[in-house]
Amino acid sequence: TKASVGFKAGVKDYKLTYYTPDYVTKDTDILAAFRVTPQPGVPPEEAGAAVAAESSTGTWTTVWTDGLTSLDRYKGRCYNIEPVAGEEHQYICYVAYPLDLFEEGSVTNMFTSIVGNVFGFKALRALRLEDLRIPPAYSKTFQGPPHGIQVERDKLNKYGRPLLGCTIKPKLGLSAKNYGRAVYECLRGGLDFTKDDENVNSQPFMRWRDRFLFCAERIYKSQAETGEIKGHYLNATAGTCEEMIKRAVFARELGVPIVMHDYLTGGFTANTSLAHYCRDNGLLLHIHRAMHAVIDRQKNHGIHFRVLAKALRMSGGDHIHAGTVVGKLEGERDITLGFVDLLRDDFIEKDRSRGIYFTQDWVSLPGVLPVASGGIHVWHMPALTEIFGDDSVLQFGGGTLGHPWGNAPGAVANRVALEACVQARNEGRDLAREGNEIIREASKWSPELAAACEVWKAIKFEFPAMDTL
């Protein structure tokens, strides 16, 4: 539209401009699938168009400055609407965004555009971003994970099995020296990693520098004793980006292999800065998803975790927590495995049964190791080994430290259980069917495992999953 044609003031329906069912998506478009619940009386076409408009070029009334640009080139378009099976008044609205709307290499800008404003929109009862298709033309502007799965295995010299971790508990209140002691016991017993809890930053009872020093000392001691490379996820999350980088620099100076960040509370800008620092300086980066359930738990409103996982792969992280399917925290099997594949694989085919709305081609962006953590113990080991496969980190906090004989025997029990499951799988046994039997056999020659089996034989966290398709 040329400005000289004359400008028609007034409010017009979004669907006249932003609902384009004939649109053929381009390879360079960012595609979004929104679950839209319109207010009563609002047709789905208008609701879908409103989402496209408010997350791209639109505003509530016609403005004369529209004539100074080409809306056809820059507007988001709602190009398809499907009713959600089994839900009344819910629709999946597909929106295509031209690539030029987004700053290169900025997850922050991508989210500000796509979900920044539109979720408070009055014509909608609720809105959830279910999935995004990131075109290679955009993903190529990101560094992505500092190292990725293969480089991490090479750095650690550990192959052919999942990695084992443990969150140090009690998460708050230990002194730095006692904290280091707990780290040492776990690593000496056979774990690959121990972890700062997500809310351990730098509190009065344990300042960050003291913790880093005591943990580094204990990492070296356990490495010398076991002959294996060990790590502790030193949480560098801080109140400012400068302080965060300062902590990462200190970790690098200590020569430890890995640091950690809470990427949602810390923010994507901080996370991307830290990921760049980690690649430049050879540090692995463990990512915790603290605050994710605030955003992703409601079925009809918010952002699904698979979108937050894709965003993390772009922003950068080598590990990310991804639910367990079997422990105390949320995670439905097919859906969880859907976003686990989105984290690890180069190419993921569209598969609605697993919640994957678009085919995603990551080209050569490094992969991220999914971390299973939360309420898991030795009896879960066969299921975890089968569900997550080799490229994963299995993290037992209480499942290590809660062992009746202490941390090191708890670590031994987990390592023995894992090695038994991997060996059984490699021999062609069915972990799903024979899992309990495999653990029982192994416990005959490992008193530590036998004691762990006894303590947790009846523990289950069985609630119906919230995250259904």
From Swiss-Prot:
Its cofactor is Mg(2+). Mg(2+) binds at residues 195, 197-198. Binds 1 Mg(2+) ion per subunit. One of its GO terms (molecular function) is magnesium ion binding. It is found in: Plastid, Chloroplast. PROSITE patterns: RUBISCO_LARGE (PS00157). Keywords: Calvin cycle, Carbon dioxide fixation, Chloroplast, Disulfide bond, Lyase, Magnesium, Metal-binding, Methylation, Monooxygenase, Oxidoreductase, Photorespiration, Photosynthesis, Plastid. The record marks 328 as: Transition state stabilizer. It catalyses: 2 (2R)-3-phosphoglycerate + 2 H(+) = D-ribulose 1,5-bisphosphate + CO2 + H2O; D-ribulose 1,5-bisphosphate + O2 = 2-phosphoglycolate + (2R)-3-phosphoglycerate + 2 H(+). The modification N6-carboxylysine is found at residue 195. The active site is at residues 169, 288. Its main location: plastid. The keyword Chloroplast applies. One of its GO terms (cellular component) is chloroplast. Substrate binds at residues 117, 167, 171, 289, 321, 373. The keyword ATP-binding does not apply. One of its GO terms (biological process) is reductive pentose-phosphate cycle. The basic functional RuBisCO is composed of a large chain homodimer in a 'head-to-tail' conformation. In form I RuBisCO this homodimer is arranged in a barrel-like tetramer with the small subunits forming a tetrameric 'cap' on each end of the 'barrel'. HAMAP family: RuBisCO_L_type1. Belongs to the RuBisCO large chain family. Type I subfamily. RuBisCO catalyzes two reactions: the carboxylation of D-ribulose 1,5-bisphosphate, the primary event in carbon dioxide fixation, as well as the oxidative fragmentation of the pentose substrate in the photorespiration process. Both reactions occur simultaneously and in competition at the same active site. Heterohexadecamer of 8 large chains and 8 small chains; disulfide-linked. The disulfide link is formed within the large subunit homodimers. This is Ribulose bisphosphate carboxylase large chain. It comes from Coleonema pulchellum (Confetti bush). The gene is rbcL.
